[in-house]
Amino acid sequence: AEQLVTSPVGSEDLRYANLAILGRLVDSIIEEQVPRALELAPDLVSIVGGGNDCMRPGTDIDAIAAKFEEAVVALREAGIAVLMGNGYDTRRATPLIKQLRPRVAIYNSHLWSIAQRHDCTMLDMWGLRDLYGPEMWAPDRIHLSPAGHELVADQALAALERAPLPSAGVHMPDRPNRPIRTAVAEEAHWVREHL
């Protein structure tokens, strides 16, 4: 919010309300956060959701996207500009999280279509290659670290300014090679702590 005030798309009159709660599912976002955002009647709402839904086995990705679109429609019909964020690429994530890649990719395809249909700005986290270094992630390897949040905030501002992604191409940082025994032990510890 501080960066937005001094940016070409911001103003001194900017007021900021963070309604986000980590771990929410799309249903909860629609039922709790979107109505509150509508009450505030802002000029802009940023909405990122669905990642936790994608992690749940059996979730109908198409249905989640349809619900997300309902929220976007409600915001746009109220005259609110919408900044949407898509899911990150799990290609270099832990072996368990890596398995979500097809689900996240399908969900992201829906999000891009929603953004186009309703004239929304897209924060492309999938394409933000600088996001994939280990320092960008919290110990749970699901949520961003402070450095990751800063990078995403910078990119959100760039998206609002219609600037290109800061790095292009498909290269992602390599994961360090670890002995299989070490990798299995680390993954088992991660599962116990974070799943």
Indicate residue ranges for each PLM-predicted region:
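Surface-exposed cleft-lining segments at the edges of enzyme active sites
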Residues: N52-D62, P95-Q99
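Substrate-gating cap/lid alpha-helix
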Residues: R92-W126, P146
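A short helix->loop->beta-strand "cap" motif at the edges of active sites that frequently abuts
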Residues: E77-V82, C120
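Serine-esterase "nucleophile elbow" of acetyl-processing enzymes
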Residues: A1-L22, E32-A41, V45
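Cell-envelope and extracellular/periplasmic
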Residues: A20-R24, G49-C54
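Glycine-rich anion/phosphate-binding loops
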Residues: I21-E31, G58-E70
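Alpha-helical scaffolding segments of alpha/beta enzyme cores, especially the outer helices
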Residues: A63-E77, P102, I106-S113
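Conserved catalytic region of serine esterases and O-acyltransferases that act on ester linkages
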Residues: S113, R117, D140-L195
